[in-house]
């Protein structure tokens, strides 16, 4: 009988601790009234941190180097 009561007490403590962990101190407010979800473009990665990467230079899109556009 004693091992059964110990197991029940351990299960009670475990489940009550899990219930306390799931509670939040602030109420969760979600408003989805004016939300527009736009999928990312497949042409460019979302975070292109490499400024020397392919396709990130405007001269690639124009077909000529940008520094040759200005007359010296």
Curated annotation (Swiss-Prot):
List GO BP terms, alphabetically.
response to antibiotic
Per the record, its GO cellular-component terms are: outer membrane-bounded periplasmic space
Keyword Nucleotide-binding, does the record have it?
A: no
Keywords attached to this Swiss-Prot or TrEMBL record, sorted alphabetically, are: Antibiotic resistance
Pfam families annotated for this entry? Answer: MarB
User: What InterPro entries does the database record attribute to this sequence?
Assistant: MarB (IPR025732)
Instruction: Name it.
Output: Multiple antibiotic resistance protein MarB
- Record the organism: Escherichia coli (strain K12)
């Amino acid at each position: 009988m004693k091992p059964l009561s110990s197991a029940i007490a351990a299960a009670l403590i475990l489940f009550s601790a899990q219930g306390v962990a799931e509670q939040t101190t602030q109420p969760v407010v979600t408003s989805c009234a004016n939300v527009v979800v736009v999928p990312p473009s497949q042409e460019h990665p979302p975070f292109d941190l490499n400024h020397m990467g392919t396709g990130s230079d405007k001269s690639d899109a124009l077909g000529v180097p940008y520094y040759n556009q200005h007359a010296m």
